[in-house]
C-alpha cells in the first residue's frame, strides 16, 4: 500500500495475491484500477478473512478469482518474479499433490496479516502482550507506564476505523 499510495510506484503488471483479508482484497481492486492484471487471490483458509462487501466490490466486480484453501507452493524467477505456483491444501493446511496451478506473473503481493508497530512503545519500557503483539493496558487503555495510553492499531490490528475511534475516545 505504501509503495502505491504514498510513493506513487506501480509495483507490477501481472499480479498474484496471497491472503484475502480486507487489505488484500482492497489491494486487488487498487492494483486493477492502476492497470495491473490481478490473476488470482489465494487464501490458505477455507474462508476469506475479508468483509463480504469487499469480496463483492474488490473481486467479484472485477472478475478476480478467489481460490480458498490454496497457498503458494512455488516461486519462479531470478532478479524478478516470473511466475507463482499455487496448490489446494487439505484440512491440515498441507498442499495436496496434483492440484498445482502455475500463474505467469511479475508480482506476488503478500497480505498475510498485520502486526502492530510498537518500536516506540517498547523503547519507553511498556510491557507487551504476546497474543496481540500490542501493549498491555488497563480498562482505560493506560499502559504500565503512567500517562502513556494505547489505542488503535498500536494496541491490536482493527478491521474498521469505528473501533479505533471508540478506543481513542476511551483513552482520551
Positions of PLM-derived features:
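Residues forming the flavin
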Residues: 1-172
Amino acid at each position: 500500500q505504501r509503495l502505491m499510495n504514498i510513493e506513487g510506484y506501480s509495483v507490477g503488471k501481472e499480479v498474484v495475491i496471497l491472503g484475502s483479508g480486507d487489505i488484500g482484497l482492497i489491494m486487488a481492486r487498487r492494483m486493477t484500477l492502476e492497470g495491473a492484471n490481478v490473476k488470482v487471490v489465494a487464501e490458505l483458509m477455507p474462508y476469506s478473512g475479508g468483509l463480504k462487501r469487499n469480496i463483492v466490490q474488490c473481486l467479484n466486480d472485477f472478475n478476480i478469482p478467489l481460490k480458498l484453501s490454496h497457498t503458494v507452493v512455488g516461486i519462479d524467477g531470478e532478479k524478478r518474479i516470473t511466475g507463482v505456483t499455487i496448490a489446494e491444501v487439505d484440512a491440515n493446511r498441507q498442499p495436496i499433490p496434483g492440484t498445482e496451478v502455475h500463474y505467469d506473473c511479475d508480482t506476488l503481493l503478500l497480505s498475510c496479516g498485520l502486526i502492530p508497530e510498537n518500536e516506540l512503545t517498547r523503547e519507553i519500557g511498556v510491557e507487551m502482550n504476546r497474543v496481540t503483539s500490542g501493549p498491555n493496558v488497563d480498562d482505560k487503555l493506560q499502559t504500565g507506564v503512567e500517562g502513556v495510553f494505547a489505542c488503535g492499531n498500536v494496541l491490536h490490528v482493527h478491521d474498521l476505523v469505528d473501533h479505533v475511534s471508540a478506543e481513542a475516545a476511551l483513552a482520551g
